[in-house]
Amino acid sequence: MNSETLKSMLQQGQDNLLLRYGLGQALVNEKRHSEAVEHFQKALEFDPDHSSSWKLLGKVFVELNEYPRAIETYEQGIHVAERCGDLQAAKEMKVFLKRLKKQAV
């Protein structure tokens, strides 16, 4: 779904983890990264253990050249993913974090 459809659902009073995550994803796909931040953050308010939201929020911060926030987000996301047993997400975020730290040097 595109972001406008998802925003319409939000305006109609629907608000939950999957709607916010989906809206964040749609905005990323539309290259509207700064708008996506709030929706991934809201998704994490619904479920702080949602590894995919941490991962995409980190990617958004990278796209926005907000590297310290991206590093912090990936570090938190890795901790959450490992604690919850989401080893694939943890592995991916570790790779992204390693690349980001190399790039920042």
Residue spans for each PLM region:
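Canonical positions in the second alpha-helix
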Residues: M9, K42-A43, G77
